Structures are given as C-alpha cells and as structure tokens.
A protein has these predicted regions:
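Non-catalytic terminal accessory segments
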Residues: 1-59, 301-317
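Soluble catalytic domains of enzymes that build or remodel membrane lipids, polysaccharides, and related
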Residues: 64, 69-303
C-alpha cells in the first residue's frame, strides 16, 4: 500500500533526524525496540482502518446537490433537475449490485433527466454483458430521458462491442450529437477528447438557437475556453476522479484548470464530477464517489401585462 510506504518513509525521516540532532525523550531511547514494534502495529492498524473507510466510500456514494442559475429563459420551463453519473467503470469491481444501487439512488431524486457522462465501462464489455447490466440501467426513470456519452474507456479494448451494449441500455447515445429533450433547451453530447476526429463544438452548434439554454456533456474537462467562446451555458464533465487516492488530488490541480467541482469561466458554468465509480482498486482516500443532482433554474420568460405591455424579465432565484 502507498500509505504503508509513506508511513515507513516518515519513520525513516524521523530516525535520520534523530541521528543528525538527537531529540527523542529518554524513555523512548531506553525502550527503542518496544517503540519500533508499537509504531509498526500502529501503522498497520491505522492503514487497515483507512482502507476500510476508503472501501466504504466507494461502496456508498454520496448525493451531491449542486444549484445553478442559467441566464437564459427556457420557454415556460423555470427549472430542470438533472442526475449526472460519470465514470461508472462497470467491470470486475463495479458490478450488478453496485449499478442497481446507483439506479435506485438516481430514481430517489426524481430527476427530469439523467446523464451518464462517459467511462460507463472499464476495459472489457463482457462483465456488463454477462451480468445483463443493461437491464438495470433500463430502470432509470426520467421523463426527459437518459443520455449517454463516450469517455476514453469506451475507446479501450472491444470498442464495437461496447457501442452495441450501450445501445441496449435504454438511453440515447450522443456521439457528437445535438438534441432538444423538450424543445426548451439544447443538450449536446460530444465524442471523447481521445478521438482526434471528433467534431468541433462550433460545427456541432451550427443551426443551434443560442437564445435558448445550451448544456454540453464532454467527458474530459479540457474544453472550457472552447465552450465559453461558443456561448455554452453549462458544461458537465467527469474523467478526473479528483485523483481518487490522496495525494493525487494535489497533482490533479496542476494538470487541469478545474479537476473537481463547480467552476465558472466567463458566462459559462461548469461542473466536474469525481465520478460515482472507480478505476483500479476499490478505494477512495480524500475524495468521494458521488451522484450529482443539478438543480437548474432558468431566467423567467418575458410576461405580457393585462394591456399587452411586456413586463421586465424576472431572474429566477
């Protein structure tokens, strides 16, 4: 474990500091062997407890409520509730039982729409196929539908089999696609950044009425400036896992403009999820497995007064 290694490294630094400038109390120096044994067991029990908590964090995702106000009107719709799940990584670790838990958690939020923001599967599709997990995802309930985009893991291993399986889940697969779930706003699902031939956002937005709210799903959070330049109102991302295991969250801050959470660049707002699943071992330290519930408020439409005069727009709070 990285944490046992770090603990031993700290102990070695303490030992070296003692050699350079003695500072241990007399009772410790007089019982050094017993002290080393005690420290060893403290490390083992401490790391074991940490890993139990880290496993529990993965197995019990939290519900993260995010409140966002968009500056455009969406027809007669004043609000929209979206459940966002990214980075399920269905495979050897994330199996049928956990996916059923995710679905139940999503349905309990009573969302208008559900989005699965990439990396639905880990490497091989056979784990999802053999367990018929598509039947579980079909149980997701949302009146405006379920929408799915590719992540980088959808391009690993048997890509065509993954595509066929995703088509069976009951959701709408958006690969460089634009839809209007209920005609009041646009939802754009981008192909993953790893695919060098994916369409530009500018080309996807040809014919889009920028007077309506525009929400973009893009697995990897690299395109903040592009979204801002093209008039996108809200970008939803995953991919980073927020580092998953400490101290990697610290490194993520050096790599990404925003590796986790809410962010705003110009008029465009973003949310980067740490993901509901995991990649690799089933542990999280210093991060969370999350199901994101986006509570979106739209600008109120112009209303006509009794004598036909237009009233001032009202900003929804």
């Amino acid at each position: 474990s990285i944490y046992i290694t770090l603990s031993l490294l700290v102990l070695e630094l303490i030992r070296l500091s003692q050699r350079i400038k003695p500072w241990f109390p007399k009772w410790m120096k007089g019982h050094w062997q017993q002290t080393k044994v005690t420290l060893f067991f403290l490390i083992v029990f401490g790391v074991t407890g940490l890993m139990i908590h880290a496993y529990h964090t993965v197995m019990n995702p939290i519900v993260k409520n995010v409140y966002i106000t968009l500056p455009k009107a969406a027809g007669d719709r004043d609000s929209l509730t979206i459940v966002m799940m990214s980075d399920l990584h269905i495979g050897e670790v994330i199996g049928k039982d956990l996916v059923q838990k995710y679905v139940a958690l999503s349905n309990a939020q009573h969302p208008d729409m559900v989005v699965l923001a990439g990396d639905i599967m880990d490497y091989e599709s056979r784990f999802a196929e053999n367990a018929h997990i598509e039947d579980d995802l079909k149980q997701l309930k949302a009146p405006l539908g379920v929408y799915i985009i590719y992540g980088n893991h959808e391009y690993r291993a048997n890509r065509n089999a993954k595509y066929r399986w995703l088509q069976k889940t009951g959701g709408t697969l958006l690969i460089d696609s634009v839809v209007q779930p209920d005609s009041t706003f646009y939802l754009i699902g981008r192909d993953d950044f790893i695919h060098k031939k994916r369409k530009s956002l500018h080309s996807l937005m040809e014919g889009v009425d920028t007077g309506k709210p525009i929400i973009v799903l893009d697995h990897q959070p690299w395109s903040f400036a592009e979204m801002n330049m093209n008039g996108v109102d809200l970008g939803l991302h995953g991919h980073t896992h927020n580092g998953q295991l400490w101290p990697y969250p610290l490194l993520m801050k050096l790599v990404y403009e925003c590796p986790y959470g809410y962010y705003k660049k110009g008029p465009t707002q973003f949310y980067v999820s740490s993901g509901i699943g995991i990649a690799g071992p089933p542990y999280r330290v210093g991060t969370v497995s999350e199901l994101v519930v986006l509570h979106i408020r739209f600008k109120a439409p112009k209303q006509t007064g009794e004598r036909g005069k237009s009233t001032m727009p009202i900003q929804a709070s």
